[in-house]
Amino acid sequence: MSDFLSTILEEKKREVEQRKRTISEEFLEERSASAMERRSLCRALATPGRRGINIIAEVKRGSPSRGVMNPGLDAAQFARRYESCGAAAVSVLTDAGFFHGKAGDLRSARAAVKIPVLRKDFIVSRYQIFESAVMGADAVLLIVRAISPELLGECLRLCRRIGLDALVEVHSAEELDAASEAGAVLIGMNNRDLSTFTTDIRTSIQLVRRMRPGQVAVSESGIRCREQIDRLLDAGIWNFLIGESLVTAPEPEAVLAHLFGAYAA
């Protein structure tokens, strides 16, 4: 694990412990049982959409490598624009310390659209699973590199219990095997190496060959043009998580139109 990722995870653990002192896990668990009806991310991605592909479009204010990219971002407005362009789902960064995200962004985005909304954060505790449900998320991101196999399995079971989908992120064959053993269905193949922050879509092309029947592949990070999508489609991948190129573009609609390309209806 890279030193930088370790720094993020240690800070996240401190954040969670601090929040627990304000709102107990028991309270969140009770609230999660009566949270709003979920929209299924798994169902939205199980087959190619009418454009031939599915895009999870991301609401993202910043990143450690780029700093603040869109300080005035209106999460609800971006989510509506994404949905109107044919996005299958919306991903919302809620990490404040490193990605400048806000929990309020997820709530605003969820209220603005009818498609599933994924909470993208660094999950290090079951507390955050209940928190995500209460926040209004339809799905959460679980990063294999960030948690133990035991916690991964526990979080997946908990997600199933309270009706959340889980996108389980991997970057290597070993991580994919761990995700599969834990029972993951939605597999997010991160083309970005969290140790070096370089991206290479060949990561997804190599990993999809190891996936088990019934699993659903999502290619994440570094996807900026239709040619890359064509290569990934040839490998059998039709789901793509797109973030930075959308929130930094003057017209996200134009970027999405380019990515959908000839697949537009």
Curated annotation (Swiss-Prot):
<comment type="similarity">
    <text>Belongs to the TrpC family.</text>
</comment>
<dbReference type="InterPro" id="IPR013785">
    <property type="entry name" value="Aldolase_TIM"/>
</dbReference>
<dbReference type="InterPro" id="IPR013798">
    <property type="entry name" value="Indole-3-glycerol_P_synth_dom"/>
</dbReference>
<dbReference type="InterPro" id="IPR045186">
    <property type="entry name" value="Indole-3-glycerol_P_synth"/>
</dbReference>
<keyword id="KW-0456">Lyase</keyword>
<dbReference type="InterPro" id="IPR011060">
    <property type="entry name" value="RibuloseP-bd_barrel"/>
</dbReference>
<dbReference type="GO" id="GO:0000162">
    <property type="term" value="P:L-tryptophan biosynthetic process"/>
</dbReference>
<dbReference type="GO" id="GO:0004425">
    <property type="term" value="F:indole-3-glycerol-phosphate synthase activity"/>
</dbReference>
<keyword id="KW-0057">Aromatic amino acid biosynthesis</keyword>
<dbReference type="Pfam" id="PF00218">
    <property type="entry name" value="IGPS"/>
</dbReference>
<keyword id="KW-0028">Amino-acid biosynthesis</keyword>
<comment type="pathway">
    <text>Amino-acid biosynthesis; L-tryptophan biosynthesis; L-tryptophan from chorismate: step 4/5.</text>
</comment>
<keyword id="KW-0210">Decarboxylase</keyword>
<dbReference type="GO" id="GO:0004640">
    <property type="term" value="F:phosphoribosylanthranilate isomerase activity"/>
</dbReference>
<keyword id="KW-0822">Tryptophan biosynthesis</keyword>
<protein>
    <recommendedName>
        <fullName>Indole-3-glycerol phosphate synthase</fullName>
        <ecNumber>4.1.1.48</ecNumber>
    </recommendedName>
</protein>
